[in-house]
UniProtKB/Swiss-Prot annotation:
UniProt function note: Lipoamide dehydrogenase is a component of the glycine cleavage system as well as of the alpha-ketoacid dehydrogenase complexes. The pyruvate dehydrogenase complex contains multiple copies of three enzymatic components: pyruvate dehydrogenase (E1), dihydrolipoamide acetyltransferase (E2) and lipoamide dehydrogenase (E3).
Listed EC numbers: 1.8.1.4
Name of this protein: Dihydrolipoyl dehydrogenase
Cofactor: FAD
Enzymatic class: oxidoreductase
Keyword tags: FAD, Flavoprotein, NAD, Oxidoreductase, Redox-active center
Organism of origin: Populus euphratica
A molecular function (GO) term: dihydrolipoyl dehydrogenase (NADH) activity
Similarity remark: Belongs to the class-I pyridine nucleotide-disulfide oxidoreductase family.
Complexes and interactors: Homodimer.
Cofactor descriptive note: Binds 1 FAD per subunit.
């Protein structure tokens, strides 16, 4: 993760 911190946190 890093490019998509928001997406990873959304799960």
């Amino acid at each position: 993760v890093g490019k998509f911190p928001l997406l990873a946190n959304s799960r």
